Amino acid sequence: ILERGDALLVVQWNIRAFTGVKKWPWMELYFEIEPLLKSAEAEKEMAAMKEEFGRIKESLEKSEARRKELEEKMVSLLQEKNDLQLQVQAEQDNLNDAEERCDQLIKNKIQLEAKVKEMNERLEDEEEMNAELTAKKRKLEDECSELKKDIDDLELTLAKVEKEKHATENKVKNLTEEMAGLDEIIAKLTKEKKALQEAHQQALDDLQAEEDKVNTLTKAKLKLEQQVDDLEGSLEQEKKVRMDLERAKRKLEGDLKLTQESIMDLENDKQQLEERLKKKEFDISQLNSKIEDEQALVLQLQKKLKENQARIEELEEELEAERTARAKVEKLRSDLSRELEEISERLEEAGGATSVQIEMNKKREAEFQKMRRDLEEATLQHEATASALRRKHADSVAELGEQIDNLQRVKQKLEKEKSEFKLELDDVTSNMEQIIKAKANLEKVSRTLEDQANEYRRKLEEAQR
């Protein structure tokens, strides 16, 4: 609303200013001159537009002439293009079959290279697994050595416990002897108590003290007997643990030996597979070279085959022309024979033939025989040439088919060897998985034995305390 109010004020101020100056003389003069200024500018613009129209018209005529010239060139170029397209199409039709065969051979080669690459990747995976297995083998050997060290420490601890047991047994024996002596003293004191009970009241107090002492010694005896039983139980437990550890140790050593033998067998299998893979790669490279040579030979044979086919077609055309000429000569001979017979009949009717006519007849007959022999020789020569070319063509086709069959047999052999190689790789993979499982089981048994040894060690420390 404020903006609209400001705008109204500005408009009102402009109108007020215009009404104030419109009656001035110079403003009236301006109003009269302004239309004249516009008409002068319009005439200048019209002259400029006419000049521009002339230039544009001249440019248009030049462009039209140039367009016609380009259209004529375009027609000629289109004609040449169509001719070239026809030639290219003809050449392309001739090359399609050869390109299809080459493409098929290239596809086969690419497939073989892909299969070789896949085998190489699998071999690299097997090598990585073998390296991991070797590292795990070293780790297992280290763990076995540590376990052996723990077993030796446990044996030293058992020997120490044996010594402590003997010392405890000696203490128990001494306490037993003391208890026997105390029993004798108690019996003696009891007898003295019964005999001197009335006379020795003070002795009763001493006897009560002695009984308290005996009770204390009895409790000590029971405690020592309990300790002896605990030590004997611990000793039996330690013996059992030692026997279990010995059995586990022997089992681990046997499993370790079997694992080492399996690893050696796998390394030998791996080395053999690597050698076979190198041999296969060499065979494949030779086969690729042979395939390239065969492809070049196939191209040469195809080129030669096309040349022979073209030559056969030319010879067949010549033979057909010779046959046509022979038919014409035969027709001419029959016409001449018929004419000769008619002449002979006329001469006979005329009453005889002159010597000139006889010579002419002989000359015609000789020329006819010569033409006939030349025609037969040419026909035989053309037929022999055509037969030789057909035989050569058949031999080339047979040779090409034999080479293709050889390539197919080599391909089937490689496919079979590839399948066998894949089965061997599967066997090696299965063996590696079994060894990994066996290793995991050994690690589990080792951890269990280590936990048991720690538990027994803790019990021994508690028993010693």
Swiss-Prot record:
<keyword id="KW-0518">Myosin</keyword>
<keyword id="KW-0009">Actin-binding</keyword>
<keyword id="KW-0505">Motor protein</keyword>
<feature type="modified residue" description="Phosphoserine">
    <location>
        <position position="334"/>
    </location>
</feature>
<feature type="modified residue" description="Phosphoserine">
    <location>
        <position position="285"/>
    </location>
</feature>
<dbReference type="GO" id="GO:0000146">
    <property type="term" value="F:microfilament motor activity"/>
</dbReference>
<dbReference type="GO" id="GO:0030016">
    <property type="term" value="C:myofibril"/>
</dbReference>
<dbReference type="GO" id="GO:0051015">
    <property type="term" value="F:actin filament binding"/>
</dbReference>
<keyword id="KW-0514">Muscle protein</keyword>
<keyword id="KW-0963">Cytoplasm</keyword>
<keyword id="KW-0175">Coiled coil</keyword>
<dbReference type="GO" id="GO:0005524">
    <property type="term" value="F:ATP binding"/>
</dbReference>
<keyword id="KW-0597">Phosphoprotein</keyword>
<comment type="function">
    <text>Muscle contraction.</text>
</comment>
<feature type="domain" description="Myosin motor">
    <location>
        <begin position="1"/>
        <end position="35"/>
    </location>
</feature>
<dbReference type="GO" id="GO:0032982">
    <property type="term" value="C:myosin filament"/>
</dbReference>
<keyword id="KW-0067">ATP-binding</keyword>
<feature type="coiled-coil region">
    <location>
        <begin position="36"/>
        <end position="465"/>
    </location>
</feature>
<dbReference type="GO" id="GO:0016460">
    <property type="term" value="C:myosin II complex"/>
</dbReference>
<feature type="modified residue" description="Phosphotyrosine">
    <location>
        <position position="456"/>
    </location>
</feature>
<dbReference type="InterPro" id="IPR002928">
    <property type="entry name" value="Myosin_tail"/>
</dbReference>
<dbReference type="Pfam" id="PF01576">
    <property type="entry name" value="Myosin_tail_1"/>
</dbReference>
<protein>
    <recommendedName>
        <fullName>Myosin-6</fullName>
    </recommendedName>
</protein>
<comment type="subunit">
    <text>Muscle myosin is a hexameric protein that consists of 2 heavy chain subunits (MHC), 2 alkali light chain subunits (MLC) and 2 regulatory light chain subunits (MLC-2).</text>
</comment>
<keyword id="KW-0787">Thick filament</keyword>
<keyword id="KW-0547">Nucleotide-binding</keyword>
